Each structure stands twice: as C-alpha cells, then as structure tokens.
Amino acid sequence: MSEFLTKVENIRAVLRDKNLDAAVIRRNPNLAWLIAGRVHVPSNIEAACFDLVITHSEVFAVTNAIEAPRLKAEEFPKELEVKVIAWWEGRDPLLPTGSTVGSDQPGAERSDIALEIEQLRQNLSAQEIERYRKVCVDSAVALGEALKNIKATDREIDVAGAITDALWKKDLDVAFMGVAGLERVKKFRHPLPTESVVGNRVVASICARRKGLIASTTRIVTFGALSDSDYQEYLGILGVEAAMLDATVVGKPFSAPIEAAVAAYPAHNFDVHEWHNHHQGGPMGFLPRDWTASLSTTRAIANNQAIAWNPTGKGWKAEDTIITTKSGIEILSNDPSWPSLTIAGRTRPDLLKR
C-alpha cells in the first residue's frame, strides 16, 4: 500500500472510531502531510488550493480548473481522484456537511477531528523521516552558505535576500525568516528583517519548507573580536538547549523539557525569568510549530516526532530540528561545513567568527 493510501486508511480508522461517514480535510499542514506535496498558491495564507474528502469507500480532491492540471501533474499521488470546478465556483457545494462528517476545520456543522488528524501526522513514517533529513540538511547548508558571504556593513534585508536565494536554489521556500543585527538582537525575539545594518553580530533563524515538511534552524555570525563574556553567554544558551534535549524523551510530557529549561537558565547565568521572554519551542513538521509547549502541557512526546526547541537570551539563540526515537533524539539540521563544538556529547553549531 502506498504512503498516501496508508494515511487515508488511518483517517478511515478515525471515522470508524467516531462513527462518522466522511472526513473533509482543509488545513494546509494536514493536506501537505497527506499528499507529501505543496498545497498552497500564495504562501502566506492559510487556505489551500484544494480540499480532500475521505469516505469509507472513496477519496477525492476538489479543486478548480486553474489548479487541477498542475496538481495532477506535480503534486497529487496517482491514486487520488480529482473533481474539478470552474474557477468562478466555490468548492463548498461538493463537500459533505453535517454532524456525521468530520473535519479539521470548523464549519457546516461538521464534527471536529482536528486533534485526531494532528495526532496521526505527529508520528512520521520512515519515508517521511528520510525526506525530512534531506530537507533539514539542505536548509542548514543553504543558511550557512549565505551567512559565510555576508558583511558587517550589510543590512538585515540584504542578509535575508541572500538566505532566500540560497534556499530557493535548493528547492526550499521560506515559511519564516528572522534576521537581527547587533542593534536589534537584544530587543526583539521575532526580528523580521529591516534596513538596519547588522554590525558585529547577526542572528538568522529560518523555517524552510519543501513539499510540506518544514525545517527550523538558527545560526549566528560575529565580526571582529568577541569578548569572553559574550562567548560564555552563547555557550550558556547551548547549555540550556542541552538540558532541554536531555529531557526530550518519548513518552514523557512536553512539560518536561520546559521544566528543564526553567532550571537551566539561572544555572547558566541567565535571569531566573529569562524563559518568560520567549516561547521555548514545540512539536513541528508541517508547521513551524504545531503549538508551543509550556509547563502545563500534559501531552506526551511521541515516537518519530519532529520538534524544535529554541532557547534564547541576551541576544543569543540555539535552534535545530530534531526527531525523537525510543533510543534518543536525532538532530536533523546539521551542516558539516559549519563550525561546531561538542555540548553534552552532541555536535552543536559554534559561532561563525569572521
């Protein structure tokens, strides 16, 4: 059975369990997971360019005459039937409605199965993990290639342009990009790039996407002399991250890595409330984050689940994409050409000192 049909059968099991007749899948991350492809046209809106309907006996997509040829040729699995409407028509009339129909998006009196669908896609398949490793390595390498050529006199938007160019050359588009030079790096935790000159430090964070799978990575470049105190602060952030990675154990609650971070910040000479200033990350895969973990999160860490932690403090940040396994975590977004050091037995990115 193909990867696509396996996922369809898993959704049919949800239908049987909840005594439903059909499912209407509408959200971008769930559609991308199902078809292992691109589901958007404009990249900055939630609405996908098609819907999927799954019943106990059939599965079909509903899209318009503009998108159908491309989707059938380049994105859809061969087993998927496609129902095509005129571009001026809406898709809703072809979608089943009522309480015996489940959906990942509210509306038309359908039953809510959003959580069940999210739980299905949190356990990545072997095929998905193989693709994900490639996405993560390619995104980290592209980010590194761009950052190795920037100058202290560049503007943040120049850096963002170089990163975007490097990503697209590796068939990766940008789901998120943050770039901060020295002037802004201690002020803002989500620094959308501006015309500000980067100066002697630049922190670049990306969420890069290919065929729905998203990789999160942060790398930092410094220019000129770096004080020992500054470097110790960076090592401190890596220490916080190490505590979180150690606490990321299949079956444990997502609150465990957050508890580890809360304890690790003051242990590494950060303010005891540093963790209040930014979320610490959470599960991901087909979104930059499915949701952010907190001290009150009781959901368990799943096997083969993608996660990105992102501790920050004093203008420093650590972030990479990992996959959980029953024998420990695997860091996916490694760039073998980037300077590295060993923290808690793991290879972690060093600063690129220019």
Which residues fall in each region the model found?
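Active-site neighborhoods and metal-handling regions in enzymes and metal-associated proteins
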Residues: 1-354
